[in-house]
Swiss-Prot record:
Protein name, entry field: Adenylosuccinate lyase
Keyword vocabulary terms for this entry: Lyase, Purine biosynthesis
Similarity field: Belongs to the lyase 1 family. Adenylosuccinate lyase subfamily.
A GO molecular function held by the record: (S)-2-(5-amino-1-(5-phospho-D-ribosyl)imidazole-4-carboxamido) succinate lyase (fumarate-forming) activity
Purpose of the protein: Catalyzes two reactions in de novo purine nucleotide biosynthesis. Catalyzes the breakdown of 5-aminoimidazole- (N-succinylocarboxamide) ribotide (SAICAR or 2-[5-amino-1-(5-phospho-beta-D-ribosyl)imidazole-4-carboxamido]succinate) to 5-aminoimidazole-4-carboxamide ribotide (AICAR or 5-amino-1-(5-phospho-beta-D-ribosyl)imidazole-4-carboxamide) and fumarate, and of adenylosuccinate (ADS or N(6)-(1,2-dicarboxyethyl)-AMP) to adenosine monophosphate (AMP) and fumarate.
UniProt pathway annotation: Purine metabolism; AMP biosynthesis via de novo pathway; AMP from IMP: step 2/2; Purine metabolism; IMP biosynthesis via de novo pathway; 5-amino-1-(5-phospho-D-ribosyl)imidazole-4-carboxamide from 5-amino-1-(5-phospho-D-ribosyl)imidazole-4-carboxylate: step 2/2
Record's catalysed reaction(s): N(6)-(1,2-dicarboxyethyl)-AMP = fumarate + AMP; (2S)-2-[5-amino-1-(5-phospho-beta-D-ribosyl)imidazole-4-carboxamido]succinate = 5-amino-1-(5-phospho-beta-D-ribosyl)imidazole-4-carboxamide + fumarate
Organism: Streptococcus mutans serotype c (strain ATCC 700610 / UA159)
Lineage: Bacteria, Bacillati, Bacillota, Bacilli, Lactobacillales
Length: 432
């Protein structure tokens, strides 16, 4: 992933140095397991643990000849050892090392993502509580519907991210796995003890059955969950973009002193962070498709998945880490304009209270059809002529014969729409 969208801690996990360190650890742990079984002299394993190392340039040099990165790696490591070098890669096939190391790298990446998710959820919770009763316009189809609160909008984000966290924990466990079962997965040249020993030491699970590779449905699910997280962020970002439009200006991304919004128009303050999230979510969903394409391999294995995973594994985890942190800061520092929200509610002449007017008339004895057919023409008159809805109700004897002035006034009270907010917050775990 390019540096622009990378954070150092996550990027370092996918560095060549860290990858080869993981490979080397798998190799050494496998030898330790063999030694536990009495198949390899423990003194040789001790020498391997002490002296085994690699030089990346040397690996690449050897690979120019071998055209096989694992063979190049094992030969480069062997050059740093004495006679004990014969135990390097003993009983292993390349993917025993690569897939198990991948499981270990995913574990490292997931630890960062887990912290990111927890921090992001906390930011949303704080902002939702802050604006729990900040009344604003609810919109459906882009059209004014009925009042809601900005806190409730944020609460839907909170609930969605909680579900994403649950999905993430399940999917993360799937890819934090290793396999050391040999060339076709039948343990012909290596006992299951070695697999269990290595995986236990790495803190990952041993996959119960494999071919030459771990089953890639595990990875497809994992990348699908990361895509779900990215898409949730995109949904939230799209909301901010919509609410920041000049004619609404209900929220605004923080705009720093000296920041520029356009090379041509000095007045511009664009929601570039949220737009950035939309673009990156598209990339991650594309990687999800690639992960699903990787499931169908020939027989016990081919390497069609390998080239793709060298890209999507680092890029997707790096991007999710970046997105959670950047969008978390956007939400944390978001400027909210309650007065603009109030102003916008009034821009549709009180029509947003039409359902309540209809329901109140039903409560006073009208059928639903009668009430609907009485109210709807007045909404059309209000909208078409750009006049307030309330006076049209007050001028109709059929309505005033059923409703007092106080009851009509109450219909147009936006606070009515906040009466269940506490209950909803309690239901999703955001109650005080």
């Amino acid at each position: 992933m390019i540096n622009r969208y990378s954070r150092p801690e996550m990027a370092n996990i996918w560095s060549e140095e860290n990858k080869y360190r993981a490979w080397l650890e798998v190799e050494i742990l496998a030898d330790e397991a063999w030694a536990e079984l009495g198949e390899i002299p423990k003194e040789d394993v001790a020498k391997i643990r002490e002296k085994a190392d690699f030089d990346i340039d040397r690996i690449l040099e050897i690979e120019q000849q071998t055209r096989h990165d694992v063979v190049a790696f094992t030969r480069a490591v062997s050059e740093t050892l004495g006679e004990e070098r014969k135990w390097v890669h003993f009983g292993l096939t390349s993917t025993d090392v690569v897939d198990t190391a991948y499981g270990y790298l995913y574990k490292q990446a997931n630890a960062i993502i887990r912290k990111d998710l927890d921090n992001f959820l906390s930011i949303i919770a704080d902002k939702a509580k802050e604006h729990k009763f900040t009344i604003m316009m609810g919109r459906t189809h882009g059209v004014h519907a009925e009042p809601t609160t900005f806190g409730l909008k944020l609460a839907t984000w909170y609930s969605e991210m909680k579900r994403n966290i649950e999905r993430f924990e399940h999917a993360a466990a799937g890819v934090e796995a290793g396999k050391i079962s040999g060339a076709v997965g039948n343990f012909a040249n290596i006992p299951p003890f070695v697999e269990k020993y290595v995986c236990d030491k790495l803190g990952i699970r041993a996959q119960e059955i494999s071919t030459q590779v771990l089953p890639r449905d595990l990875h497809a699910e994992y990348f699908a969950v990361l895509a779900s997280i990215a898409t949730s962020i995109e949904r939230m970002a799209t909301e901010i973009r919509g609410l920041q439009k000049s004619e609404q200006r209900e929220v605004e991304e923080f705009f720093a002193k000296g920041q520029k919004g356009s090379s041509a128009m000095p007045h511009k303050r664009n929601p570039i962070g949220s737009e950035n999230m939309t673009g990156l979510a598209r990339v991650i969903r594309g990687h999800m498709v690639t992960a699903y394409e990787n499931v169908s391999l020939w027989h016990e294995r081919d390497i069609s998945h390998s080239s793709a995973e060298r890209i999507i594994a680092p890029d997707t985890t790096i991007l999710i880490d970046y997105m959670l942190n950047r969008f978390g800061n956007i939400v944390k520092n978001l400027t909210v304009f309650p007065e603009n929200m109030k102003r916008n509610m009034g821009s549709t002449f009180g029509l947003i209270f039409s359902q309540r007017a209809m329901l109140t008339l039903i409560e006073k004895g009208m059928t639903r059809e009668q009430a609907y057919d009485l109210v709807q023409p007045k909404t059309a008159q209000s909208w078409d002529n750009q006049v307030d809805f309330k006076p049209l109700l007050e001028a109709d004897p059929e309505i005033t014969s059923r409703l007092s002035q106080e009851e009509i006034d109450e219909i147009f009270n936006p606070v009515y729409y906040t009466k269940r907010v506490d209950e909803i917050f309690d239901r999703i775990g955001l109650g005080d």
